[in-house]
């Protein structure tokens, strides 16, 4: 029977009669268990121990030889006369020594801690020695050479929960809107966010790598559906008058959409009239800047602000009244 313990929980795996273990006996091997713990639980805060067998060879003196030696010493001390000792050959002496001592294999079972390397990033850097950093480096990389340097830093942000966003939403907001991206500036300057904020809607910024995966698994939160602002066909809260104007724009520019789709057939999937661009001049400036520079500059790069300002002065303003379609304005800038 083999088993191992996880902390004080006492998780015990038995070999006898368990079909899963009979099919995969390698998961009972000491080597395999250590690999799993190292891969998935190396830096767990509580100790993980494995009940292992330890063997060692030890030279144990022969009890009978020791008794004879004691008797000889006592006899020598009691006799004042010098004792004549028959000294044999070296081979005989070596044989006697070998007879006196023999090797015995000793077995011992102990609880071996598998995750000795503690999460040192949770500790104060001033309390961590260079040796501890070295041990951490070796356990993490299996590289036994000395590390070159150490940079220990800690970054913490304010913990916020998704349900807290409900408190700042307006009563007419039917969905929980979110946008994913690499930086806060990137998502905050998105045309999608600009449109929703114009309508007074709250948008959650998700800029962590894990956010995009997690939010895809979250379909609903407290009776409100979770919706990406970049989703095709995103519906915004509009009154009847706004809906009527939008339908009129779609009808008016239906032929233009078809022409643009035919011209850009291999480059675009669809051309539609959108109400998500509240400031087309701002978006056009970004496109104009990239064309001017002749390369795809990161539009959120702060080093490009000076260049952007200079180009904006050269950029002719868009023409048209408030009732002019957003698509017409963008098209007219060319």
From Swiss-Prot:
Entry-linked SUPFAM superfamilies: ATPase domain of HSP90 chaperone/DNA topoisomerase II/histidine kinase (SSF55874), Ribosomal protein S5 domain 2-like (SSF54211)
Region Disordered, residue ranges: 55-107, 314-334
GO cellular component: cytoplasm
Compositional bias (Acidic residues): 85-94
Basic and acidic residues: bias regions: 59-69, 320-334
Motif TPR repeat-binding, residue range(s) on this chain: 327-331
Compartment(s) of residence: Cytoplasm
Modified residues (Phosphoserine): 89
Any coiled-coil regions, as ranges: 234-267
Alphabetical keyword list: ATP-binding, Chaperone, Coiled coil, Cytoplasm, Nucleotide-binding, Phosphoprotein, Stress response
InterPro entries in the cross-refs: HATPase_C_sf, HSP90_C, Hsp90_fam, Ribosomal_Su5_D2-typ_SF
GO molecular-function term, one example from the UniProt record: ATP hydrolysis activity
Record remark on domains: The TPR repeat-binding motif mediates interaction with TPR repeat-containing proteins.
Subunit composition and interactions: Homodimer.
Family: Belongs to the heat shock protein 90 family.
Biological role stated in the UniProt entry: Putative molecular chaperone that may promote the maturation, structural maintenance and proper regulation of specific target proteins.
The protein's name: Putative heat shock protein HSP 90-alpha A5
Organism: Homo sapiens
